[in-house]
């Protein structure tokens, strides 16, 4: 049983629910600043709750510290947890800068503990399928990637910089898993206070990728995501619409000399799959090849490249 201490009661409450669905974890303690909310959490989940963050990271029972704090606090408390002999599971992004992320990486090596970052997009069924399709090269060489997401203001502030850091970044993790870091980036965008549109063109040798994040949709519109992978001998395309009243997902593969294939997608929850992956890595004492600090740093590097071009 992996014993967990959670820092933060914003997205941390979502993590609490997720842990309750995955066997092998036990929540020991939760830190937050809102005493009323902490009381509700303690009663609902039968856990210890505190406004003293050190009570969680110093707790000898805690094996894994789950960080759901504001991004600017991620690296600080990841390092503090590592110093105290804890493994770390951190919400994405791991840090605000490559320098901070590298400090976390060095601390993990120094103290001999594992760092996992919630790069959940890699466990999304359609994205997993696309990644495997690209790696197997069954449709020939990969020529281009296009990925998009669109939303209304339901996620709060997604102005230009916040868009790149908290919305655009999921697509970045997807593309980096397939193609690695680009040689250069050209980004453009339009900023409307707490809303924005960001388009990034990623340049590789013999490959292009275009990412677009739009947080300007009216509130009546559904959340949309999708991607298209262009191969020498075919195209793989996924489009999804998520609305309060309906959902629609479609994954099509079109290849030379073959009938169009509608891919049947498993209904796995990518967030639960992340926890199962972490559990396996900790039980087997192996490093993650998908969501470790090394993979997370690549995402932070790409974010800095995009922001440098954009701002």
Task: Enumerate the predicted regions with their spans.
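Beta-loop-alpha module in the N-terminal Rossmann-like domain of NAD(P)-dependent dehydrogenases
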Residues: 15, 45-105
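Short polybasic amphipathic segments
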Residues: 227-229, 244-257
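Contiguous beta-strand/loop segments that form the cofactor/metal-binding neighborhood of enzyme cores
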Residues: 166-244, 275-285
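A contiguous active-site-proximal alpha/beta segment in oxidoreductase catalytic domains
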Residues: 95-155
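A short helix->loop->beta-strand "cap" motif at the edges of active sites that frequently abuts
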Residues: 47, 84-86, 111-113, 206-207
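Hydrophobic residues in well-ordered beta-strands that form the structural core
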Residues: 51, 90, 115-117, 238
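C-terminal helix-rich "cap/oligomerization" subdomain common to oxidoreductases
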Residues: 55, 64-69, 110-113, 263, ...
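N-terminal Rossmann-like dinucleotide-binding module
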Residues: 1-45, 279
């Amino acid at each position: 049983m992996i014993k967990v201490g959670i820092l933060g009661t914003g997205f941390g409450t979502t993590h609490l629910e997720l842990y309750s669905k995955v066997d092998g974890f036990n929540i020991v303690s939760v830190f937050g600043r809102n005493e009323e909310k902490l009381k509700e959490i303690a009663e609902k989940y039968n856990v210890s709750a505190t406004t003293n963050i050190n009570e969680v990271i110093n707790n000898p029972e805690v094996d894994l510290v789950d960080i759901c704090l504001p991004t600017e606090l991620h690296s600080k408390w990841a390092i503090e947890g590592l110093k105290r002999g804890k493994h770390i599971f951190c919400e994405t992004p791991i840090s605000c800068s490559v320098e901070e992320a590298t400090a976390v990486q060095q601390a993990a090596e120094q103290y001999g503990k594992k760092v996992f970052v919630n790069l959940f997009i890699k466990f999304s069924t359609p994205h997993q399928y696309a990644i495997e399709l690209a790696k197997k090269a069954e449709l020939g060489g990969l020529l281009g990637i296009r990925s998009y997401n669109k939303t209304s203001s339901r996620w709060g502030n997604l102005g230009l910089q916040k868009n790149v850091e908290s919305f655009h970044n999921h697509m970045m993790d997807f593309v980096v898993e397939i193609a690695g870091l680009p040689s250069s980036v050209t980004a453009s965008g339009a900023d409307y206070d707490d809303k924005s549109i960001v388009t990034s063109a990623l340049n590789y040798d013999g490959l292009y990728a275009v990412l677009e994040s739009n947080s300007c949709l009216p509130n009546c519109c559904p959340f949309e995501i999708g991607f298209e992978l262009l191969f020498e001998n075919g195209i793989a395309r996924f489009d999804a619409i998520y609305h309060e009243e309906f959902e629609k997902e479609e994954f099509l593969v079109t290849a030379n000399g073959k009938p169009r294939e509608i891919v049947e997608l498993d209904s796995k929850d990518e967030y639960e799959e992340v926890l199962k992956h972490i559990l396996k890595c900790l039980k087997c004492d192996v490093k993650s090849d998908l969501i470790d600090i090394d993979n997370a740093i690549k995402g932070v590097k790409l974010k800095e490249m995009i922001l440098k071009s954009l701002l």
